[in-house]
Amino acid sequence: MNAPLPEHLRHALATVTLDDKYSLKSGRAFMSGVQALVRLPMLIQERDAMAGKNTGALISGYRGSPLGGYDQALWKAKSYLEKHNIVFQPGVNEELAATALWGTQQMGFAPPGTQKFDGVFGIWYGKGPGVDRCSDVFKHANMAGTTPWGGVLAVAGDDHVAKSSTAAHQSDHIFKACGLPVFFPSSVQDVLDLGLHAIAMSRFAGVWSGMKTIQEVVESSATADINADRVKIVLPEFEMPPGGLHIRWPDPALDQEARLFDYKWYAALAYIRANRLNHNVIEGPNDRYGIMASGKAYNDTRQALVDLGLDVETCQRLGIRVHKVSVVWPLEAQTTREFAKGLKEILVVEEKRQIIEYQLKEELYNWPDPQRPRIVGKFDELEGNDSGGEWSVPNPMAHRLLRANADLTPTLIAKALAKRLLKLDLPSDVLARMNAQLSIIDAKERAQNSLVLNPAADRMPWFCSGCPHNTSTKVPEGSRAMAGIGCHFMSVWMDRSTVGFTQMGGEGTPWIGQQHFSHEKHVFANIGDGTYFHSGILAIRQSIAAGVNITYKILYNDAVAMTGGQRVGERAEGHTVVQIAQSMRAEGAVIIKVVTDEPEKYSGVALAEGVLVHH
């Protein structure tokens, strides 16, 4: 038990450092999913150098959970990034960051002799709401295209259960609407491997690649293989149109659309197929039941099988085929059809709204009845009703199999899987084992549900000690305030007469819609300095343009406190009170006051004309 470690292990452990994830040239290193996103562009640049190309990279975006610490990780790794020609330039907001990355690909038609590198690739990052607001940029840039040694990866941080968001998010459908193929890693190693494929596919097919990440993956840690040549990229045979698929100028809009619809997506599919990005992980000679899963849901499905007592050998014995989908849109058809052949039924396991399930149903719809497997996912069939569709009955709850809201767990998946498998003719030993395991699962669930927490132990989140929000979110008696995105959102559950909120950058503008129809004459709106810098100044401009009577409390603490305390504006001096006051005067605000517990700080400071300082 206390025997000394072998010498080779002791030597290996003695040389381990926290910087291994960035400094090692080969081997394995311990890292988180976020740190893998830092190492990823280094690996891409190293592979390019191995191919004889001198490339650079731009990383830009806007912080937000579960990618809230990505910018800090990039800053910490600055010395390593610089050695790989990688520039990190945070965006004022998500869409401007995406536009900057579009600019890296426009170097494809820059004047001859002006470029320092053979190509510049890019990584965009943002939270789910940031994906929403970037759709215009994504569509334009994706249709315009990429360069042969450029390429762009857009990384979305999705909060499926609204753990730190005002709404649950699923970026798959936004990426799809913008025409970006969607990668969904299930592990730290996947972040590296699929990230390499995503940029390679972006270069080959002339599209931007999307990558969906969630907390359970990017905030997990693991030992990953960091060899630059680990991933063997296969460029498929594909008949390119005249002029190829890359960015060019001039390029009429309808030509771009036709190139995307008729060639780019199919080039991406050829890449997915050639590199087996979607593949069977469990299969046998007599398979009859199929399971398709992606991302976190794939991990949960494997755990659900274990919880039911179905190891790999038992799955092969029963004829259960498991298919891992790493690119959820577009769903590669040939691989999908091969997976579906010979199966009687397929269960699609994916969190949130259907994206794989609908594509699978479309792909197999015209198969002859004897060959076409039944497909279930979010819903199964009712007794006497074979539809199994989402809109088949007035109340879908009656035949819901795997919920689309919130998230999925191994327990939910195990119950759904057991419900379907128990319809099969299972061997008696397997049947007995599954029923025993289900009893254990049910017992655990009952035990958890029986736990009653003492309400007195509840503790709602509150402002940090010393934070100016403790006092600045209070309003005079008889007044009310509107909330928005930021730490000050917490005032909605405090006794501060704060009701309602908006999306980031919309703070206060609901009053424009209300004031014409209300006897109220005035409201307050809270807005943090981080949101103000991001997009909130436009909400203030809208209120001034509309001429409404509103007081904006620009809550200044010189930090984006919710995501790590980063400086506002990404500059050493941050975004100062003086700058904000001058901007508000220029926008036409009638009364501007600085309220502070240290008024002496502004003695002799050249604030905008008419700005008063109050204690």
Describe each PLM feature range.
Residues 59-61, 154-156, 348-350, 551-556, ...:
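Short internal beta-strands
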Residues 40, 44, 73, 77, ...:
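Generic, well-ordered alpha-helical scaffold segments in large soluble proteins
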Residues 65-204, 214, 470-474, 480-562, ...:
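Thiamine diphosphate
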Residues 454-475, 493:
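Cysteine-cluster motifs in flexible loop/terminal segments that predominantly coordinate metals
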Residues 50-98, 114-116, 284-331, 367-378, ...:
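Anionic-ligand anchoring segments at beta-strand to alpha-helix junctions in alpha/beta enzyme folds, i.e.
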Residues 588-615:
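C-terminal catalytic or substrate-handling cores of phosphate/nucleotide-
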Residues 209-211, 355, 426-427, 524-525, ...:
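Acidic/polar loop patches that form or flank catalytic/metal-binding clefts of enzymes
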Residues 1-40, 44, 185-451, 456-463, ...:
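Flexible, low-complexity linker and terminal segments
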